[in-house]
């Protein structure tokens, strides 16, 4: 039942942790605190393809991660999205937004991303991991 993570995600994101259903990865864009949840199920492209138990678990994990992102990055606004036009593998974006970020109120995709420096990447991953351990 375990799903392999798309090569695109491996190239453009960093592993944070595994939850019961989803793998959590940090998108390599230092402009925005941005994680993706990737369900560990084979050949799934849409939420409706998950069984009802996994649909409920996915919702719980989305809500859990959303609360953590708000707490960690001290934001009041999140973008929670399931798009999948470029990478069809089911994944959910959770992006902490601010009225002060570079594209507010537009989409994060309207500007080119900025990869994390090695130092900031380690710091950000450790910051997020800490909350998953609590």
Which residues are covered by each model-predicted region?
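HIT superfamily nucleotide-processing domains
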Residues: 1-134
């Amino acid at each position: 039942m375990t799903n392999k993570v798309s090569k695109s995600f491996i190239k453009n994101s960093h592993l944070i942790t595994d939850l019961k259903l989803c793998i959590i990865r940090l998108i390599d864009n230092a402009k925005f605190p941005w994680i993706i949840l990737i369900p560990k199920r084979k050949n799934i492209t849409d939420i409706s393809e998950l069984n009802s138990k996994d649909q409920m678990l996915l919702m719980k994990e989305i809500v859990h991660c959303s609360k953590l992102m708000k707490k960690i990055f001290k934001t009041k606004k999140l973008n929670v999205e399931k798009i999948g036009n470029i990478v069809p593998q089911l994944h959910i974006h959770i992006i902490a937004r601010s009225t002060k970020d570079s594209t507010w109120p537009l989409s994060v995709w309207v500007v080119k991303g900025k990869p994390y420096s090695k130092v900031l990447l380690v710091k950000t991953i450790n910051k997020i991991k800490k909350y998953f351990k609590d």
